[in-house]
């Protein structure tokens, strides 16, 4: 995962814990989760728009 192993992830987590404190972590996690959910929803909607905007083939008579 981007060359980041478990020890590096733990160090990053400890630094975040020190900066924001234990009380803010659930708030931050919820905000990140909502952001990811909205991003996925928007990307799925753009795929649906692309499929609907394709011109339909008209067959000659």
From Swiss-Prot:
GO cellular component term of the entry, any: TAT protein transport complex
Molecular function terms from GO: protein transmembrane transporter activity
Entry keywords, A to Z: Cell inner membrane, Cell membrane, Membrane, Protein transport, Translocation, Transmembrane, Transmembrane helix, Transport
InterPro entries linked: TatA/B/E, TatA/E
One GO BP annotation of this record: protein transport by the Tat complex
Membrane topology (UniProt): Single-pass membrane protein
Record has Hydrolase as a keyword: no
Subcellular location: Cell inner membrane
Highest rank taxon of the organism: Bacteria
Transmembrane region(s): 1-21
Task performed by this protein: Part of the twin-arginine translocation (Tat) system that transports large folded proteins containing a characteristic twin-arginine motif in their signal peptide across membranes. TatA could form the protein-conducting channel of the Tat system.
Quaternary organization: The Tat system comprises two distinct complexes: a TatABC complex, containing multiple copies of TatA, TatB and TatC subunits, and a separate TatA complex, containing only TatA subunits. Substrates initially bind to the TatABC complex, which probably triggers association of the separate TatA complex to form the active translocon.
Family annotation (NCBIfam families): PRK14861.1, tatAE
Protein name: Sec-independent protein translocase protein TatA
Gene source species: Syntrophus aciditrophicus (strain SB)
């Amino acid at each position: 995962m981007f060359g980041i192993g478990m020890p590096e992830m733990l160090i990053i987590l400890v630094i975040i814990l020190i900066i924001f404190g234990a009380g803010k972590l659930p708030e931050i996690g919820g905000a990140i989760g909502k952001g990811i959910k909205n991003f996925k929803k928007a990307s799925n909607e753009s795929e649906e728009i692309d499929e609907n905007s394709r011109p339909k083939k008209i067959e000659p008579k």
